[in-house]
Design a protein with these regions (language model features):
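A structural detector for beta-sheet-dominated domains
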Residues: 36, 90, 100, 114-116, ...
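Generic structural motif recognizing short loop/turn segments at the entrances and edges of beta-strands
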Residues: 22, 29-31, 83-85, 107-109, ...
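A Rossmann-like FAD-binding core segment of flavoenzymes
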Residues: 1-17, 107-128
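FAD-site-proximal beta/loop scaffold in flavoenzymes
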Residues: 4-56
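A conserved FAD-binding loop/helix module that cradles the flavin
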Residues: 49-92, 96-98
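Non-transmembrane, interaction-prone segments in cytosolic or luminal domains
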Residues: 42-43, 63-64, 70, 74-76, ...
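Short, solvent-exposed loop/linker segments at the N-terminal edge
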Residues: 101-106
Length: 128
């Protein structure tokens, strides 16, 4: 893309026609774009957040993602790139999906996840 732009959309279900037009990889579980911890897709300079990634229960989470995306996009513009995110986030059968799908392992980051069913007295283990 030879231009900068900001596209805002309001809706619940991920619609990714623009993502597909740009060759962005979609996640089979979320039906949204795959992103790294900076909310950058697998296409450098193309970022995604909110319901275009996965359905959110609260707009607060969309706002938090958008804030992180804005910081990341500004860093990308300033530095010309972001740290490589080559660690794939994998889940077991009890977790439907996570966002992001890739992390760097060099910075703290937040993982959003959706479980397949409600759990009681459970423990979440994150390891590398």
């Amino acid at each position: 893309m030879d231009h900068y732009g900001l596209i805002l959309s309001v809706g619940l279900i991920p619609e990714n026609e623009l993502s597909l037009d740009e060759g962005v990889t979609l996640d089979a579980r979320t039906k949204g774009a795959t992103v790294d911890e900076y909310f950058q897709t697998d296409r450098p300079g193309i970022f995604a957040a909110g319901n275009v990634l996965h359905v959110h229960d609260l707009v607060d989470f969309v706002s938090m993602e958008a804030e992180k995306l804005a910081d990341s996009a500004a860093r990308y513009i300033k530095e010309g790139k972001l740290p490589a995110c080559e660690i794939q986030v994998k889940t077991d059968k009890n977790i439907n999906h996570t966002v992001p799908q890739r992390i760097s392992g060099t910075e703290d980051c937040c993982l959003s996840l959706r479980v397949n069913r409600p759990f009681k007295d459970c423990v979440l283990v994150v390891s590398h």
